[in-house]
Amino acid sequence: AAERLLDETNAWLGIHPLEAWPVVGTPDSEQRFVAYSQWLTASGAPADVVQELSARQRRRSRHFTEQRVTRELEDGAYLPLPGRKLRVVWTPGHTAGHICIADEDHEILFTGDHVLPTIHPNIGAFADRPDADTLGGYLASLEKLAPWGEYQICPGHEYHFRGLAERSAQLRARLAGRLEEVAAARAAQPDATPWEITAGLRWRRGWDALENTDREDALAATRAHLNHIDHTDPTKSAN
């Protein structure tokens, strides 16, 4: 879709530099497939799950094409749109290069996947950054949006709303509760793999009811919590 817009209109594609590799890179590269399978295996996923999800990843890659990024959007920059003051706010967490856009003239904040009215965005440590403190980055990004707290929030999903501070507090509280649960699970089973820890956590539909694609997201989220524990408390041993 992006390629068609670029070809048939005067539109341009702009992303944060850290978003470049998953968008612009070649998603069918063998190196990426190997890294993905290694990430699943290192996390303790069963061999049949690794095989299923790796095959799915290859099938999905056939629908991707290399994107032509025409502008890199740095934190604090303004979009090159005459007559508008649209400020780029870098908010890593959901992805490394996630950005929000602040419309300073109309007091609107476009939050993408960063802050949603009821959904909790997936904050995971996937194969592209398996050891990164993505959760710590997300929490810092929530704080970063405080100056736009009175703006109307227009997210990438659901509906627009007001009350950024209240919603951010809800998100932080939920993550804090999950951190406690993950830390307790690790303490109870210090030799457990991330997959085993994930399987033992509470899930709304229950772990056994989840498809393997959903389990992958759950695994990435658990790894993000484990990474945050390791980054904030060096006495914790990494899994």
Predicted regions, residues:
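C-terminal helical/coil "lid" or tail adjacent to the Rossmann-like core of SAM-dependent
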Residues: 30-34, 168-182, 204-210
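Active-site HxH/HxHxD metal-binding segment of metal-dependent hydrolases
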Residues: 1-80, 169
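Feature marks short, surface-exposed loop/turn motifs that line or immediately flank catalytic pockets
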Residues: 21, 118, 162, 201, ...
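Metallo-beta-lactamase
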Residues: 52, 58-68, 78, 85-179
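C-terminal regulatory/interaction regions
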Residues: 181-239
